């Protein structure tokens, strides 16, 4: 009798577990399942990645290095051929590799919250423009948008020219030089963002700038280590087992940005003193400045009670990260491609010679806008090598997508820009480098969201025009003086996941001075 009772209880338990498992991925730590509007199997729309352990996809990245983490997403996209789903650590994850889904996600006003993974950046960036949500994000976006107005960007052109010429000075007296782009380009972009956005030259802080970049890499290392190990997703466990080197790196980068802010405050106070140190003098300073740094906007907003010092620190850390790192990636791969495709380089060079005077001090945005071949070249570079290969969102309520999927509240959505940009549905021979793809006649029928290097929708990159202007200016200056030759076989490049797109190996090019 007891045996029959136990058998019956076991059957009931199995039935209960079966019913529960229809709504929750039990072994994925009770992740609520994705479902469909019409009741069809969601895997017919978004195939499910087979987990590496019995715990669904929770430990798929465990033990993988930076290259392994990067390749995991690429392998899933190639194997499944469409946007796909995963379940990990109690969460449903929808991975987008098609333009239709990307458009739906990036345009949804209810999907502006960044994914949970961005929480790992809070100790570094706190809740600045990149990581904030809701009213705070809207207020900060509104506050900072005017600082990227055409008139402001036009004022920055003088700095971009100066920094570009300073970049070339390091090769003075050399007819040729082999350089590591990973070393020289980040220094250039950090100098540029500090002088334009912060109003502070790094000439006397070069060593501190180098320390900033070194410790930025340490922060990135900890971020990837944490992302790939679910055991470290807990703040408590991360602090117990992995935070020591992270904390010291944070001290360095925050100390650097704080010094930048302090220097700019001192400069502004000195200007006010020179005008008579009155409220009128202070008001006139902010209304009559010839060049208005983005940091000035934040300091002015502080005086109006719209932001506090911590808020300024948040936005400075964010602007420095996004303005220095993402642009350097675009330039590194852009100059690499210049070396690998000599015919395209020559086309850009001839266009520059036809439109730009040798006296670069008078180079303006209007002239840069005439360089269409260079623009197509940069766009094709960013298609193949997007600085940010993926971006994340989190659903704050049950969300229905255009393909019929219904994502539960708290689901994570990753828009894989790298895979969308190489999706053969939108790009013929997607692995080939062909700038002519961006000619108007070749672009007009392409899905708008098949190319999103600066994201899209209301959370698109606020500084995309700034980045394009900076990249064009350096490329013009460099091509005016040098021919760029290859020193790397592109087949040997090993990509890595980071805060932005990384390579395991250094990218070298050879500069040969033009006669």
Curated annotation (Swiss-Prot):
Subcellular location, in the record's words? Endoplasmic reticulum membrane; Microsome membrane
Q: Which Gene3D superfamilies match?
A: Cytochrome P450 (1.10.630.10)
List the record's Gene Ontology CC terms alphabetically: endoplasmic reticulum membrane
What are the record keywords, sorted? Endoplasmic reticulum, Heme, Iron, Membrane, Metal-binding, Microsome, Monooxygenase, Oxidoreductase
Query: Where's it mainly located?
Result: endoplasmic reticulum
Q: Which InterPro entries match?
A: Cyt_P450 (IPR001128), Cyt_P450_CS (IPR017972), Cyt_P450_E_grp-I (IPR002401), Cyt_P450_sf (IPR036396), Cytochrome_P450_Monoox (IPR050196)
For membrane topology, the record states:
Peripheral membrane protein
Broadest EC class assigned to this enzyme: oxidoreductase
Output the Pfam families linked to this UniProt entry: p450
Instruction: Report a single Gene Ontology molecular function.
Output: monooxygenase activity
- This enzyme's EC code(s): 1.14.-.-
Write out the similarity annotation.
Answer: Belongs to the cytochrome P450 family.
Question: Which PANTHER family does the UniProt entry name for this protein?
Answer: CYTOCHROME P450 4P1-RELATED, CYTOCHROME P450 FAMILY 4
Q: What is this protein called?
A: Probable cytochrome P450 4p3
Q: From what organism does this protein derive? A: Drosophila melanogaster
């Amino acid at each position: 009798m007891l045996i029959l009772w136990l058998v019956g209880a076991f059957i009931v338990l199995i039935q209960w577990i079966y019913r529960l498992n229809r709504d929750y991925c039990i072994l994925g730590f009770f992740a609520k399942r994705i479902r469909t509007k019409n009741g069809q199997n969601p895997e017919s729309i978004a195939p499910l990645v087979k987990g590496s352990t019995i715990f669904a996809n929770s430990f798929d990245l465990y033990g993988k290095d930076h290259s392994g983490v990067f390749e995991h997403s690429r392998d899933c996209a190639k194997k499944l051929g469409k946007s796909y789903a995963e379940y990990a650590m109690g969460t449903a994850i929808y991975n987008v590799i098609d333009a239709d889904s990307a458009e739906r996600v990036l345009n949804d006003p209810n999907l502006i919250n960044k994914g949970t993974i961005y929480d790992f950046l809070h100790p570094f960036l706190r809740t600045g423009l990149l990581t904030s949500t809701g009213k705070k994000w809207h207020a900060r976006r509104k506050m900072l948008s005017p600082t990227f107005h055409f008139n402001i960007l036009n004022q920055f052109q003088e700095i971009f020219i100066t920094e570009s010429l300073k970049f070339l000075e390091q090769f003075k007296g050399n007819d040729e030089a082999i350089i590591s782009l990973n070393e020289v380009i980040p220094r250039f972009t950090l100098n540029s963002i500090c002088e334009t956005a912060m109003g502070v030259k790094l000439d006397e802080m070069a060593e501190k700038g180098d320390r900033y970049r070194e410790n930025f890499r340490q922060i990135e290392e900890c971020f990837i280590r944490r992302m790939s190990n679910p055991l470290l997703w807990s703040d408590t466990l991360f602090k117990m087992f992995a935070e020591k080197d992270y904390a010291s790196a944070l001290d360095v980068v925050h100390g650097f940005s704080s010094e930048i802010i302090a220097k700019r405050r001192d400069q502004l106070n000195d200007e006010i003193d020179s005008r008579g140190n009155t409220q009128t003098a202070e008001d006139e300073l902010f209304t009559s400045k010839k060049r208005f740094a983005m940091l000035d906007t934040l300091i002015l907003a502080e005086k109006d009670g719209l932001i506090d010092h911590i808020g300024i620190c948040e936005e400075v850390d964010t602007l420095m990260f996004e303005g220095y790192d993402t642009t350097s990636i675009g330039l590194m791969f852009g100059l690499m491609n210049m070396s690998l495709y000599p015919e395209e380089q020559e086309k850009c060079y001839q266009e520059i010679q036809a439109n730009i005077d040798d006296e670069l001090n008078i180079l303006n945005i209007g002239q840069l806008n005439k360089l269409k071949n260079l623009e197509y070249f940069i766009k094709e570079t960013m298609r193949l090598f997007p600085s940010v290969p993926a971006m994340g969102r989190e659903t704050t309520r049950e969300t229905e997508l255009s393909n019929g999927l219904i994502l539960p509240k708290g689901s994570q959505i990753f828009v894989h820009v790298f895979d969308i940009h190489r999706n053969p549905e939108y790009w013929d021979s997607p692995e080939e480098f062909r700038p002519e793809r961006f000619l108007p006649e070749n672009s007009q029928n392409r899905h708008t969201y098949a190319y999103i290097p600066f994201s899209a929708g209301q959370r698109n990159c606020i500084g995309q025009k700034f980045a394009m202007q900076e990249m064009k200016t350096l490329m013009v200056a460099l091509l005016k003086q040098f021919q760029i030759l290859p020193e790397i076989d592109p087949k040997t490049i090993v990509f890595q996941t980071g805060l932005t797109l990384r390579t395991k190996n250094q990218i070298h090019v050879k500069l040969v001075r033009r006669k």
